[in-house]
């Protein structure tokens, strides 16, 4: 593993202007639109007539050091080193951490941490489009308070269009995302710089003493305000999650030399404005503008928030696909919106889920300031899970001494925990929403994983070891018929139930029998050279292990074509695929509780078939039912 990850399929990480602009359009949409609401939410705890200059400087100092510690040091300098063959993200980090340990118990703990991070990500993915679009459209109220009644309808319309166009793909529109975000960052940076020239004393907030003094002076109120300060770093996870698309170096360079300076200029500009005019604290971002430019800025901000929302939605699709490949979610339909870019996907169930929840959040909360109370807790929970996984990888994979690991990641973890605990105070003020969504997803993932493990366990108990079956085969009087039969099996050491049922009912066996097991080795991509492992068990009987990465979509016929190129004596066009379809019944002593079993059965019934998921031609498939009690 290299310090700078190389994106899959890329010859290297050469810095090109087009690549840097592309990074801006995908990676920084979320964190780049945080100035719309972060300062406003942080100042909301202080009435305008009681707002002191020292309070503004203290909050700015906390925002500055949050960006330095959480984003720059933690993600840009440390966690982006821990790539999984070029890929980033919580589940990718989880898979890497599980690869570097042999302990089943440790793997289980790592899996739970990864599941928690992924579940909380979905909680965050519902809040981001809602608060981003609302905060942008609310700029109309600065033009005229009478326009307030149009904010919700316009926000709903923008969200409706955003989710509707997902099915058509974002490749064409995505080409414009980068240049638009360049304009966005330049504009917000220039607006802030203008105010800093007017009141340069605001730069004193760069000194951490002001942040520390603010905390000591206001104690509990300062602790509560941390829950809004963290809004400035929401979207930091995207820097790590999108490594596979762009590589580490372009993301680091664009952050350090463009995005971070522009964000800091805007934050400090808002602070300078509020120091001069405390009443601007009601919406400091839009009060940076001359009145005549507010409407154009509302339009630009709305476009920027749509880009931010698009990045989160695409991230949710990617996490859903990874979860499916890693066995954490049932098989779901995945549509490719670009024939040449397998990263551009559309997952209908995820899109529908996000759309419904986002609309309900907009209608339920009604304003970005109300949503700010719900925002943050899921993000900070993800920060904690990522920090724990990264600490394990640094200790085991990079061989850091335990003392150094604890010192570095312990210090960062304290910052993450401070942000998380301050957001816990907002649980009853809306923070329960992303928590409920996150823990619902965690329950779904753990239930699916547990249910599949029980199915595998019961199937194994009722199955015949493959060695025993092959030992009896030469003495049997089973009629061999022409053709090739492929039997899918979850365990290569046991005889597939579909084969036993076929023998029981049809009394024949094909001349060529291939047992196929699909595995995920915990890496994002597997090249064709490593795709298949073939073993001839006896005359005409083969065992094939196929490996697919968690960023790939398995295609069994295409993988078997590779075997023909290696000299395996069968024609894929003559293959019949035999699959088992489970019928679940309640066991005498159930191992899944009533509610979890109901959830598992619902997911099992609604999962797409193995035929569709593995891209197997439906006219070549024979399905045989199997009853399993759990």
Curated annotation (Swiss-Prot):
It is a multi-pass membrane protein. One of its GO terms (cellular component) is plasma membrane. Pfam families: K_trans, K_trans_C. The keyword Cell inner membrane applies. Keywords: Cell inner membrane, Cell membrane, Ion transport, Membrane, Potassium, Potassium transport, Symport, Transmembrane, Transmembrane helix, Transport. Disulfide bonds: none annotated. It is found in: Cell inner membrane. InterPro entries: K+_transporter (IPR003855), K_trans_C (IPR053952), K_trans_N (IPR053951), Kup (IPR023051). The keyword Transport applies. GO terms for molecular function: potassium ion transmembrane transporter activity; symporter activity. HAMAP family: Kup. Transport of potassium into the cell. Likely operates as a K(+):H(+) symporter. Belongs to the HAK/KUP transporter (TC 2.A.72) family. This is Probable potassium transport system protein Kup.
């Amino acid at each position: 593993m290299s310090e700078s990850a190389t994106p899959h399929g890329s010859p290297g990480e050469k810095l090109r202007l087009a690549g840097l602009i592309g990074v801006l359009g995908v990676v920084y949409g979320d964190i780049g639109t945080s100035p719309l609401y972060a300062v406003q939410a942080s100042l909301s705890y202080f009435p305008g007539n009681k707002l002191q200059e020292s309070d503004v400087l203290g909050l700015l100092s906390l925002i500055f050091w949050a960006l330095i510690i959480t984003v720059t040091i933690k993600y840009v300098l440390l966690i982006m080193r821990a790539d999984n063959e070029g890929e980033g993200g919580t589940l990718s980090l989880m898979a890497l951490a599980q690869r570097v340990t042999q302990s089943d118990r440790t793997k289980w703990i790592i899996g739970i941490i990864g599941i928690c991070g992924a579940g909380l990500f979905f909680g965050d993915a519902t809040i981001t489009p809602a608060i981003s679009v609302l905060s942008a459209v609310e700029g109309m109220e600065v033009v005229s308070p009478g326009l307030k009644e149009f904010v919700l309808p316009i926000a709903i319309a923008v969200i409706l269009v955003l989710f509707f166009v997902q099915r058509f793909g974002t490749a064409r529109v995505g080409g414009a995302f980068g240049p638009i975000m360049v304009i966005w960052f330049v504009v917000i940076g220039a607006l802030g710089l203008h105010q800093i020239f007017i009141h340069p004393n605001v730069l004193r907030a760069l000194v951490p003493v002001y942040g520390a003094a603010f905390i000591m002076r206001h104690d509990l109120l300062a602790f509560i305000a941390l829950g809004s300060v963290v809004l400035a770093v929401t979207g930091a996870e995207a820097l790590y999650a999108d490594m596979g698309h762009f590589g580490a170096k372009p993301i680091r360079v664009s952050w350090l030399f463009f995005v971070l300076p522009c964000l800091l200029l805007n934050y400090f500009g808002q602070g300078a404005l509020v120091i001069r005019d405390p009443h601007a604290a009601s919406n400091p971002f839009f009060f940076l503008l001359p009145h005549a430019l507010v409407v154009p800025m509302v339009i630009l901000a709305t476009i920027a928030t749509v880009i931010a929302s698009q990045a989160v939605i695409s991230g949710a699709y990617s996490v859903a696909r990874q979860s499916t490949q890693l066995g954490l979610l049932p098989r779901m339909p995945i549509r490719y919106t670009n024939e040449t870019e397998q990263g551009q996907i559309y997952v209908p169930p995820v899109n529908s889920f996000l759309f419904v929840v986002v609309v309900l959040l907009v209608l339920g909360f009604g304003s970005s300031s109300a949503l700010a109370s719900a925002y943050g807790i899921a993000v900070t929970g993800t920060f904690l899970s990522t920090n724990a996984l990264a600490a394990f990888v640094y200790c085991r994979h990079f061989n850091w001494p335990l003392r150094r690991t604890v010192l570095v990641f312990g210090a960062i973890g304290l910052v993450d925990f401070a942000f998380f605990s301050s957001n816990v105070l907002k649980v009853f003020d809306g923070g329960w929403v992303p928590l409920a969504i996150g823990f619902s997803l965690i329950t779904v993932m753990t239930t699916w994983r547990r249910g599949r493990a029980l199915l595998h366990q019961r199937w194994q108990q009722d199955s015949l070891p493959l060695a025993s079956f092959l030992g009896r085969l030469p003495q049997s009087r089973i009629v061999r018929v022409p053709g090739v039969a492929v039997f899918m099996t979850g365990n290569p050491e046991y005889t597939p139930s579909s084969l036993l049922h076929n023998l029981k009912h049809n009394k024949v066996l094909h001349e060529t029998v291939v047992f196929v097991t699909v595995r995920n080795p915990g890496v994002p991509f597997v090249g064709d050279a490593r795709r298949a492992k073939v073993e001839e068990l006896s005359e005409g009987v083969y065992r094939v292990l196929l490996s697919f990465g968690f960023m790939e979509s398995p295609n069994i016929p295409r993988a078997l074509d590779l075997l023909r190129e290696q000299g395996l004596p069968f024609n894929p066009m003559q293959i019949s695929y035999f699959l088992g379809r489970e019928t679940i019944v309640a066991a005498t002593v159930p191992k899944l509780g009533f509610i979890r079993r109901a959830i598992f059965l619902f997911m099992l019934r609604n999962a797409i078939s193995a035929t569709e998921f593995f891209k197997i031609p439906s006219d070549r498939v024979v399905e045989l039912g199997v009853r399993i009690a759990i």
